[in-house]
């Protein structure tokens, strides 16, 4: 018995010594950082069970208060990196004591200038040395772009790339073994950033997990401006109310839900969904015209679900996929301008903070498209550099996305295939795309859409349930994901059912014999 107590005591002492050594290493780490254009604010030791400090996070990004309790021991490094005489970005590097030899960079969202702390918490728990930047400015607004192309360049690509270079250097300094593999995790603008790295800096990452990417970014901004032109303001005869959009949604589900073989309230393949809205036009005897559509309103809805073309007839951006209208009615169809599109035109295209979004026309679309600063559109179809570097990319997009249509991801996949002359099986060697039914914008919707892309969608560490772990397995073991399994969560966080989401261009089909909640009752066809 005495021997067991002695062993336990020795183990406890070793753990204490290890923590003390790690704490000391962290507290003195700033003395070792001598990187060009880098100013270190602090290196802070964060023990298990402590509140994670966000001391440099401004109120516009949520402020300095944090309700996150650290489940790991890590060294939190805060610093600024100068990119020009008119621009700089803030970044943090989290260096965990449970380090696995993996480096990971996180992305941003919207016109976001806020560090993705949620993703940093998620990745560092897995032992990744993790970084996040503010992408060149603080806050979720484009006003910092006004008359400052250097800040736009940081936002387009430079902050992520430079932050990755700095982050890798810090990782090598802190850990004697350096890093074995580098990864990226991001969604929305973060998805675009991941793809920009693939296109422009193919050696930055071995594995990229990119969700709902803001591909074709400038025309995405044009697309966001176009909806006000289609719907008109709330007092116009073309406007469709949120209550009517609910009716429209029910009609879309009625027409399209069963196309995949199961009636479950979720559309598995939006390409098959081509709804006819004339079924909702009020008849001549209708008393309550708010429960149906006028002919003019039906035309509005048809336009909403149509692709955007330029003045010269050139395709600019795909349609909004059906199934997203309940959320989109408050984002795009509310009779107001879309904030991100509004900011892009005010502070980038025209450098005029008084520009009125209600004046937008296809001529403005042409001006913005021609400008495309620093190729921010991120629509290059040749990713052969990434292929040759041995990189892998797992691309996903929710089929209920109400901010960035999933048709944009399908268009990009086809663009890559056409540009590189590769078949789906050829692309599978390094690029796999998974449309996720029942997923909204980077987050769950009506279906089995928790796929482990972040803490809020955690569904286990098994690679089939976790896109980050699936990428690690692909890069390090050569086992590529054949499907992504999503979980449908109840309000209390319990798993109601799971579904395997197919690798594009295959689609999910219910074949039975079990219920639609049985993951084995579905087949990729």
Swiss-Prot record:
The active site is at 188 (acyl-ester intermediate), 401 (charge relay system), 441 (charge relay system). Gene3D superfamilies: alpha/beta hydrolase. InterPro entries: AB_hydrolase_fold (IPR029058), Tannase/feruloyl_esterase (IPR011118). One of its GO terms (cellular component) is extracellular region. Glycans are attached at residues 51, 80, 98, 283, 288, 351. Pfam families: Tannase. Keywords: Calcium, Carbohydrate metabolism, Disulfide bond, Glycoprotein, Hydrolase, Metal-binding, Polysaccharide degradation, Secreted, Serine esterase, Signal, Xylan degradation. Disulfide bonds join 26-75, 61-114, 187-442, 256-273, 282-292, 502-524. Residues 1-20 form the signal peptide. GO terms for biological process: xylan catabolic process. It is an enzyme of class 3 (hydrolase). It comes from the Eukaryota. Belongs to the tannase family. This is Probable feruloyl esterase B-1. It comes from Neosartorya fischeri (strain ATCC 1020 / DSM 3700 / CBS 544.65 / FGSC A1164 / JCM 1740 / NRRL 181 / WB 181) (Aspergillus fischerianus). The gene is faeB-1.
């Amino acid at each position: 018995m005495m021997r067991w107590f002695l062993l336990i005591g020795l183990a406890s002492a070793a753990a204490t010594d290890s923590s003390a050594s790690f704490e000391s290493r962290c507290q003195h780490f700033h003395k070792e950082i001598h990187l060009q254009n880098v100013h270190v604010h602090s290196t802070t030791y964060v023990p298990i069970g402590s509140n994670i400090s966000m001391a440099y996070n401004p109120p516009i990004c949520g402020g300095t208060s944090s309700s996150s309790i650290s489940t790991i021991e890590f060294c939190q490094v805060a610093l600024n990196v100068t990119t020009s005489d008119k621009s700089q970005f803030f970044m943090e590097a989290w260096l965990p004591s449970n380090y696995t030899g993996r480096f990971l960079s996180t992305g941003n969202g919207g016109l976001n200038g806020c560090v993705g702390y949620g993703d940093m918490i998620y990745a560092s728990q897995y032992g990744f040395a993790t970084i996040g930047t503010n992408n060149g400015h603080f806050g979720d607004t484009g006003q910092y772009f006004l008359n400052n192309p250097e800040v736009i360049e940081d936002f387009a690509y430079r902050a992520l790339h430079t932050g990755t270079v700095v982050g890798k250097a810090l990782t090598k300094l802190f850990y004697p073994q350096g890093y074995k593999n580098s990864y990226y995790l991001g969604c929305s603008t973060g998805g675009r950033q991941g793809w920009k790295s693939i296109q422009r800096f193919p050696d930055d990452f071995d594995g990229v997990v990119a969700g709902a990417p803001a591909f074709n970014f400038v025309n995405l901004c044009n697309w966001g401006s176009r909806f006000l032109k289609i719907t008109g303001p709330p007092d116009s005869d073309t406007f469709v109310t949120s209550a009517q959009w609910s009716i429209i949604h029910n009609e879309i589900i009625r027409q399209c839900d069963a196309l995949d073989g199961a009636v479950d309230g979720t559309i598995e393949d939006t390409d098959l969904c081509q709804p006819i809205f004339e079924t909702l036009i009020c008849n001549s005897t209708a008393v309550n015209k708010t429960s149906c559509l006028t002919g003019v309103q039906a035309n509005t809805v048809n336009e909403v679900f149509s692709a955007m073309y330029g003045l010269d007839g050139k395709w600019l951006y795909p349609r909004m996929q059906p199934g997203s209208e309940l959320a989109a009615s408050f984002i795009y169809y509310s009779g107001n301008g879309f904030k991100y599109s509004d900011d892009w035109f005010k502070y980038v295209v025209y450098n005029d903070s008084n520009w009125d979004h209600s004046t937008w026309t296809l001529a403005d679309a042409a001006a913005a498209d021609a400008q495309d600063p620093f190729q921010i559109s991120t629509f290059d179809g040749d990713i052969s550099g990434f292929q040759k570097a041995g990189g892998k990319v797992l691309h996903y997009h929710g089929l209920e996305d109400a901010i960035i249509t999933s048709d944009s991801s399908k268009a990009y996949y086809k663009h890559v295939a056409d540009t590189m002359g590769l078949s789906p099986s050829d692309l599978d060697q390094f690029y796999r795309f998974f449309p996720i039914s029942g997923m909204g914008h980077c987050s769950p919707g009506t279906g089995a859409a928790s796929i482990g892309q972040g803490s809020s969608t955690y569904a286990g560490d098994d690679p089939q349930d976790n896109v980050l772990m699936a990428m690690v397995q692909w890069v390090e073991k050569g086992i590529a994901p054949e499907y992504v399994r999503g979980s449908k969560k109840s309000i209390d966080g319990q798993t109601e059912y799971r579904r395997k989401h197919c690798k594009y261009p295959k689609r999910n089909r219910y074949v039975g014999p079990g219920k639609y909640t049985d993951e084995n009752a579905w087949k990729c066809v």
